[in-house]
Design a protein with these regions (language model features):
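Acceptor-binding helix/loop patch of EC 2.4 sugar-transfer enzymes
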Residues: 11-49, 90-99, 111, 153-165, ...
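Short hydrophobic beta-strand element within catalytic cores of glycosyltransferases
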Residues: 227-230, 240
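A short, well-ordered alpha-helix in the C-terminal region of glycosyltransferases
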Residues: 256, 263, 270-285, 291, ...
Length: 320
C-alpha cells in the first residue's frame, strides 16, 4: 500500500483491517504455556508497520467484527467500518442426509452417528488444538461410540513453530497412547464440499481460539446448523450468546469442555433450537449476498472528492 496513492491518485482506497496487534487484552501473552519472549514483543510492533502506513493513506477500511475493529488505535477507528467478509449460507446449510466416507478405515458416518468435530486451517495452540487434544482421552472414555473428525494442516498459521516436530506430533506424543485411533480421525485439509459434509454430520463442534481473528470456520459451522462449543473469548462472545445459539466454555478449562461436549452428545434433541438459532444468526448478520456484499459495495462506491484532491497534491510535495 505504500505507493498506491501515488500510482492511483484518483482511486478510492479501502484497506482490509483484519487485526491490529497489541500487548494487552489480545493474543499476546494470553496462553501461559507459550509465554512470549522479548522478540515476540518486537514482533507485535513490526506486524503493525505496514497497516499503520496503509491506514494513513486510505480513504476507508473494513474490519470483519466489532472486536477486531476495536483492536485499532483510536486515531484510525473513525475510518474503519465493521463488515464481515460474508458467509455463503445458500451453499453452507444443514443437510441431515449428508455422509462422510473415510475409505482408509472403511467407515461412513452420518448425522445419526455420534460425531465430534474440530476444524482449523492448521492444528495449533492459537486455535486451542492443545486443549482439545488433552480433553480427548476422557471424552472418548465417556463417549464409547463417538468418532472424532479433526480437520487441519500441520503447519503454523499464527504463533511460534516448535523445533523439529509439529503440534500434532507433539500432542500425539503426549496423549496418543490414550486415544483409540479407530475413532480419532485426522483428515488434513479437505476440499470444501467434504469439509461441509463433516460439519453437516457433526453432533458437537468444538471451536477454541485465543483473543484473535475470528475464524470463518466457526460461522460456517453455525450456518451448517452445528452445535458449536466455543471458547468464551472476546471474538467468540461477539457472535455466540451462551445457550441460545451456541455454548461457551473457558478456553483453558478441559473439564468444562469435556462435560459440555458429553452433555450435547447425551441429549441431542435438547439442542435442536440452538442449531436453528446458530444458522439464523449467520443468515441475519453474516450472509454474503444479502448482508455483507451490499455493505462492502457501498463502502467501495462512496466518493470522497476532497480527500482525493488533497492527496493528489502529495506527489508534488515530494518533488521539492
Amino acid at each position: 500500500m505504500l505507493y498506491v496513492r501515488d500510482v492511483f491518485p484518483a482511486a478510492r482506497i479501502v484497506c482490509y483491517c483484519e487485526f491490529y496487534f497489541n500487548r494487552d487484552g489480545q493474543d499476546y501473552g494470553f496462553d501461559p504455556e507459550f509465554a512470549p519472549t522479548q522478540g515476540d514483543g518486537f514482533h507485535v510492533r513490526t506486524e503493525n508497520m505496514v497497516q499503520a502506513i496503509s491506514l494513513l493513506a486510505c480513504d476507508s477500511g473494513t474490519s470483519p467484527t466489532r472486536w477486531q475493529q476495536s483492536s485499532y488505535p483510536d486515531v484510525f477507528k473513525s475510518k474503519i467500518v465493521t463488515v464481515h467478509d460474508g458467509i455463503d449460507t445458500t451453499s453452507i446449510k444443514p443437510d441431515r442426509t449428508a455422509r462422510i466416507s473415510l475409505r482408509a478405515k472403511n467407515l461412513t458416518l452420518s448425522a445419526s452417528d455420534e460425531v465430534i468435530t474440530f476444524s482449523s486451517r492448521n492444528l495449533e495452540p492459537y486455535r486451542g488444538f492443545h486443549v482439545f487434544m488433552r480433553a480427548l482421552p476422557e471424552l472418548l472414555q465417556r463417549r464409547p461410540h463417538a468418532h472424532v473428525l479433526i480437520i487441519g494442516g500441520d503447519g503454523v498459521s499464527y504463533g511460534r513453530l516448535l523445533k523439529e516436530r509439529t503440534y500434532r506430533e507433539h500432542l500425539m506424543a503426549e496423549v496418543g497412547n490414550r486415544l483409540d485411533d479407530s475413532r480419532v480421525h485426522f483428515l488434513g485439509l479437505l476440499p470444501h464440499r467434504d469439509y461441509l459434509r463433516v460439519l453437516q454430520v457433526s453432533t458437537a463442534h468444538v471451536y477454541l481460539t485465543y483473543p484473535f481473528v475470528l475464524s470463518w470456520s466457526m460461522l460456517e459451522a453455525m450456518a451448517a446448523g452445528c452445535v458449536v462449543i466455543g471458547s468464551s473469548t472476546a471474538p467468540v462472545r461477539e457472535v455466540i450468546d451462551d445457550h441460545r445459539n451456541g455454548l461457551l466454555v473457558d478456553f483453558f478449562d478441559q473439564r468444562q469442555l469435556i462435560e459440555t461436549v458429553d452433555r450435547v452428545c447425551s441429549n441431542r434433541d435438547q439442542y435442536e433450537a440452538i442449531r436453528a438459532n446458530a444458522r439464523s444468526t449467520v443468515v441475519e448478520r453474516y450472509d454474503l449476498e444479502s448482508i455483507c456484499l451490499p455493505k462492502q459495495l457501498e463502502i467501495i462506491q462512496v466518493r470522497t472528492p476532497q480527500a482525493t484532491q488533497s492527496v493528489r497534491a502529495a506527489p508534488d510535495a515530494l518533488d521539492h
